[in-house]
Design a protein with these regions (language model features):
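Sec-dependent N-terminal signal peptides
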Residues: 3-12
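A beta-rich soluble binding module of mature secreted/lumenal proteins
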Residues: 15-173
């Protein structure tokens, strides 16, 4: 009986320590095509993004090869206070430009991974290996519901808790 209990305990411990497979990555990212404005369609928000409306992330390739990033949104309502944050992205070598270190405060860099990218660069999913945050982004403020559902299915397969994903209100005139 003790041997059976020890065996079961070992199996349970082994299951608890099963590593999460690596997050999928876009196979190749053309940085010049990726640059520009991206509307945040949905996310698992960071503390600064909670209540964001009309959220847009803008990327610009700097002369030194880093990526100047500006995130702007309206706080808590479409007519709320406009907020803006900047960061700098550092592309990791050997990742087909899909993995960046995103620096909001020197010298710290946050994990930033282009997990999925539409072939026409119209939609993208940005994730983190920890699966704690995710951003569904598009070149337009809205995407078809079928596309949104497919992206949620992709994220579920990647190990995300999709019940935490919230749509970001977008209204542009």
């Amino acid at each position: 009986m003790r041997a059976l209990i020890a065996l079961l305990a070992g199996v349970l411990v082994g299951c608890a320590n099963t590593p999460t497979p690596p997050l999928a990555l876009a196979s190749q990212v053309d940085l010049k095509r990726f640059m520009g404005d991206w509307y945040v369609i949905a996310n698992i928000p960071t503390f600064i993004e909670k209540g964001a409306h009309n959220a847009v992330e803008t990327y610009r390739l700097a002369a030194d090869g880093t990526i100047e990033t500006t995130f702007r949104y309206r706080a808590d309502a479409f007519d709320g206070e406009e907020k803006q944050y900047t960061a700098r992205g550092f592309v990791r070598e050997g990742t087909a430009n899909a993995v960046w270190g995103m620096q909001f405060i020197w010298p710290f860099e946050a994990d930033y991974r282009i997990a999925w990218l539409a072939p026409d660069y119209s939609q993208a999913v940005i994730g983190r290996e920890q699966r704690d945050y995710v951003w569904i982004m598009a070149r337009t403020p809205r995407i078809p519901e079928a596309d949104y559902r497919r992206i949620l299915e992709f994220l579920l397969r990647q190990g995300y808790d999709v019940t935490r994903i919230q749509k970001v209100p977008q209204r542009w005139s």
